[in-house]
Amino acid sequence: MSTNIEQLKEDSNEDEYYLGTSKKHHKIKYPTSYRVLVFTTIISCLISIFLLYKFYKIYNSSNFLNLSEARFSVREYSQKQIEPEKINALLRVAQLSPTAANKQPQKIYIITKEEDKQKLKIVTRYTFDAPMFFLVCCDKNKAWKHKTEDYYSTEIDGSIVATNIILEAHDLGLGSVIVRSFQTQKLKELFKLPENIVPIVLLPIGYPKENTKPSENHFKRKDIKDMVEYL
């Protein structure tokens, strides 16, 4: 009798897992070491999955080469409105763009009004009916100037800013294309731009139309050996 009582006490001190729903259950007893092993294995797997996910996100979000290969000039746009947060992201990369001596002479005019779009059509035929345009300019008074030559960094600084914008646009699912074929002086007159503001490029921006594809010419790239020469 005493032996049975002692056995019952030992059973009550152990964790028990029951299978089935009938009154007569089947007892499966797992030692503590086994349960700890299972628990730590599960935690390790979850941590590994989390780290792999983070690595995947970091790698794919920062793979500049893939982004450069995937981007192409878009010349057909839908009229879907661009979300404010995406516009802000484009402006943020424009703000972060490198400029000569960090003078930051960039000035961006955002064109969305229909009357202003009609003005653009007067100075260029390359508007592609985009819902929005970034007119990337530089302030000549703020740009870096060469000490001994009559040279300002406006063109280069503005081009760097524009490049960053079109790459970010593609990363956000938007499309863009660089337009430089416009009447500079006429554009300045129509938009009443100050004399010190130098228009660099016009960027149509928007969601590409469905099934928009890069032109065949986009894939024609010079061989690197024809582009590079070691001195």
Regions found by a protein language model. Give the residues of each.
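Acidic, surface-exposed loops and disordered segments
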Residues: 2-231
